[in-house]
Protein backbone atom coordinates (compact mmCIF):
# COMPACT_ATOMS: atom_id res chain seq x y z
CA UNK A 1 0.00 0.00 0.00
CA UNK A 2 1.47 3.35 -1.07
CA UNK A 3 0.01 6.18 0.98
CA UNK A 4 1.91 8.98 -0.80
CA UNK A 5 -0.42 11.94 -1.22
CA UNK A 6 -2.88 10.58 1.37
CA UNK A 7 -3.97 12.31 4.51
CA UNK A 8 -3.62 10.58 7.87
CA UNK A 9 -6.34 11.54 10.35
CA UNK A 10 -5.41 10.82 13.97
CA UNK A 11 -7.97 8.66 15.75
CA UNK A 12 -9.01 9.28 19.36
CA UNK A 13 -6.96 6.18 20.25
CA UNK A 14 -3.73 7.92 19.18
CA UNK A 15 -1.30 7.18 22.03
CA UNK A 16 1.31 9.79 21.03
CA UNK A 17 0.16 13.20 22.35
CA UNK A 18 2.27 14.97 19.70
CA UNK A 19 -0.18 13.69 17.08
CA UNK A 20 -3.46 14.17 18.94
CA UNK A 21 -6.12 15.45 16.48
CA UNK A 22 -3.42 15.76 13.80
CA UNK A 23 -3.71 15.64 10.04
CA UNK A 24 -0.54 14.45 8.30
CA UNK A 25 -0.05 14.65 4.55
CA UNK A 26 2.14 11.72 3.49
CA UNK A 27 4.75 13.07 1.06
CA UNK A 28 6.71 9.86 0.51
CA UNK A 29 5.98 6.21 1.28
CA UNK A 30 7.96 3.13 0.31
CA UNK A 31 9.02 -0.19 1.84
CA UNK A 32 11.85 1.80 3.48
CA UNK A 33 9.45 3.99 5.48
CA UNK A 34 7.33 7.11 5.19
CA UNK A 35 7.65 10.88 5.55
CA UNK A 36 4.85 13.38 6.05
CA UNK A 37 3.98 16.86 7.27
CA UNK A 38 1.45 17.79 9.95
CA UNK A 39 -0.80 20.41 8.33
CA UNK A 40 -2.97 21.59 11.23
CA UNK A 41 -0.60 22.50 14.08
CA UNK A 42 0.57 26.11 13.63
CA UNK A 43 3.65 27.39 15.42
CA UNK A 44 2.13 30.13 17.55
CA UNK A 45 5.28 32.12 18.29
CA UNK A 46 6.75 32.32 14.77
CA UNK A 47 5.30 34.12 11.77
CA UNK A 48 6.46 33.63 8.20
CA UNK A 49 7.63 37.26 8.13
CA UNK A 50 9.60 36.67 11.33
CA UNK A 51 11.18 33.57 9.86
CA UNK A 52 12.17 35.46 6.70
CA UNK A 53 13.75 38.12 8.90
CA UNK A 54 15.74 35.48 10.82
CA UNK A 55 16.99 34.09 7.49
CA UNK A 56 17.87 37.59 6.19
CA UNK A 57 15.45 37.24 3.28
CA UNK A 58 13.97 40.64 2.41
CA UNK A 59 10.19 40.73 2.09
CA UNK A 60 8.65 42.90 -0.61
CA UNK A 61 5.54 44.95 0.20
CA UNK A 62 3.52 42.43 -1.82
CA UNK A 63 5.34 39.47 -0.23
CA UNK A 64 3.24 36.47 0.70
CA UNK A 65 2.42 35.59 4.28
CA UNK A 66 1.88 31.87 4.83
CA UNK A 67 1.23 29.95 8.05
CA UNK A 68 4.16 28.24 9.75
CA UNK A 69 3.29 24.78 11.10
CA UNK A 70 5.01 22.18 13.22
CA UNK A 71 5.47 19.50 10.55
CA UNK A 72 6.44 16.83 13.04
CA UNK A 73 8.92 15.87 15.73
CA UNK A 74 11.83 15.03 13.41
CA UNK A 75 14.45 17.69 12.54
CA UNK A 76 12.42 20.66 13.78
CA UNK A 77 15.10 23.07 12.61
CA UNK A 78 14.54 22.05 9.00
CA UNK A 79 11.88 23.77 6.90
CA UNK A 80 9.63 22.39 4.18
CA UNK A 81 7.12 24.23 2.02
CA UNK A 82 4.12 22.15 1.00
CA UNK A 83 2.52 23.80 -1.99
CA UNK A 84 0.30 23.55 -5.04
CA UNK A 85 1.91 21.90 -8.09
CA UNK A 86 2.01 25.17 -10.07
CA UNK A 87 5.52 25.90 -8.72
CA UNK A 88 8.55 23.75 -9.46
CA UNK A 89 12.14 24.34 -8.43
CA UNK A 90 14.28 22.25 -10.79
CA UNK A 91 15.93 19.43 -8.88
CA UNK A 92 14.47 20.58 -5.56
CA UNK A 93 10.70 20.13 -5.73
CA UNK A 94 9.28 16.72 -5.00
CA UNK A 95 5.92 16.15 -6.67
CA UNK A 96 3.50 14.37 -4.33
CA UNK A 97 0.88 12.34 -6.23
CA UNK A 98 0.57 15.10 -8.83
CA UNK A 99 -1.56 17.18 -6.41
CA UNK A 100 1.10 18.78 -4.23
CA UNK A 101 4.71 19.84 -4.34
CA UNK A 102 7.20 19.90 -1.50
CA UNK A 103 10.25 22.13 -1.68
CA UNK A 104 12.89 22.48 1.03
CA UNK A 105 15.24 25.06 -0.50
CA UNK A 106 15.61 28.79 0.06
CA UNK A 107 14.50 29.68 -3.49
CA UNK A 108 10.83 29.05 -2.68
CA UNK A 109 11.09 31.25 0.42
CA UNK A 110 12.63 34.02 -1.69
CA UNK A 111 9.87 33.65 -4.31
CA UNK A 112 7.15 33.87 -1.66
CA UNK A 113 8.89 36.89 -0.10
CA UNK A 114 8.71 38.60 -3.52
CA UNK A 115 4.98 37.84 -3.82
CA UNK A 116 5.60 35.03 -6.32
CA UNK A 117 5.79 31.25 -6.06
CA UNK A 118 2.94 28.76 -5.80
CA UNK A 119 -0.68 29.83 -5.59
CA UNK A 120 -1.15 27.86 -2.33
CA UNK A 121 1.46 27.04 0.29
CA UNK A 122 2.13 26.30 3.92
CA UNK A 123 5.42 26.14 5.80
CA UNK A 124 6.33 23.21 8.03
CA UNK A 125 9.19 23.05 10.51
CA UNK A 126 10.26 19.46 10.99
CA UNK A 127 8.57 16.38 9.64
CA UNK A 128 6.93 13.15 10.71
CA UNK A 129 8.83 9.98 9.88
CA UNK A 130 8.19 6.25 10.08
CA UNK A 131 10.58 3.32 9.67
CA UNK A 132 9.89 0.24 7.54
CA UNK A 133 6.43 -1.16 8.34
CA UNK A 134 5.84 1.29 11.19
CA UNK A 135 3.13 3.39 9.51
CA UNK A 136 1.34 0.30 8.22
CA UNK A 137 1.29 -1.11 11.78
CA UNK A 138 -0.12 2.17 13.15
CA UNK A 139 -2.88 2.19 10.51
CA UNK A 140 -3.69 -1.46 11.29
CA UNK A 141 -3.74 -0.64 15.02
CA UNK A 142 -6.39 2.02 14.30
CA UNK A 143 -4.18 4.99 15.22
CA UNK A 144 -4.94 6.64 11.86
CA UNK A 145 -7.69 6.85 9.29
CA UNK A 146 -6.47 7.41 5.73
CA UNK A 147 -8.18 9.44 3.03
CA UNK A 148 -7.54 11.35 -0.16
CA UNK A 149 -6.23 14.81 0.69
CA UNK A 150 -8.47 17.63 -0.60
CA UNK A 151 -6.25 20.58 -1.57
CA UNK A 152 -8.74 23.16 -0.31
CA UNK A 153 -8.65 21.61 3.17
CA UNK A 154 -4.86 21.13 3.20
CA UNK A 155 -4.26 24.83 2.45
CA UNK A 156 -7.20 26.18 4.49
CA UNK A 157 -6.37 28.83 7.11
CA UNK A 158 -8.74 27.16 9.59
CA UNK A 159 -6.11 25.05 11.35
CA UNK A 160 -8.23 24.35 14.47
CA UNK A 161 -11.13 23.17 12.28
CA UNK A 162 -9.19 21.00 9.82
CA UNK A 163 -9.39 17.75 11.82
CA UNK A 164 -13.15 17.98 12.35
CA UNK A 165 -13.62 19.32 8.83
CA UNK A 166 -11.80 16.35 7.30
CA UNK A 167 -13.87 13.86 9.28
CA UNK A 168 -17.07 15.60 8.21
CA UNK A 169 -15.79 15.63 4.60
CA UNK A 170 -15.55 11.83 4.95
CA UNK A 171 -19.11 11.64 6.31
CA UNK A 172 -17.98 10.89 9.87
CA UNK A 173 -19.36 12.67 12.93
CA UNK A 174 -16.33 13.22 15.21
CA UNK A 175 -18.51 12.61 18.26
CA UNK A 176 -19.18 9.04 17.12
CA UNK A 177 -15.51 8.02 16.93
CA UNK A 178 -14.42 5.47 19.50
CA UNK A 179 -10.99 5.24 21.03
CA UNK A 180 -11.04 1.44 20.83
CA UNK A 181 -10.71 -0.62 17.68
CA UNK A 182 -12.97 -3.57 17.02
CA UNK A 183 -12.00 -6.81 15.36
CA UNK A 184 -14.42 -8.74 13.19
Curated annotation (Swiss-Prot):
GO terms for cellular component: cytosol. It comes from the Bacteria. Pfam families: DUF179 (PF02622). Signal peptide: none annotated. InterPro entries: AlgH-like. PANTHER family: UNCHARACTERIZED PROTEIN YQGE, UPF0301 PROTEIN YQGE. Belongs to the UPF0301 (AlgH) family. This is UPF0301 protein Rsph17029_2659. It comes from Cereibacter sphaeroides (strain ATCC 17029 / ATH 2.4.9) (Rhodobacter sphaeroides). The lineage of its organism: Bacteria, Pseudomonadati, Pseudomonadota, Alphaproteobacteria, Rhodobacterales.
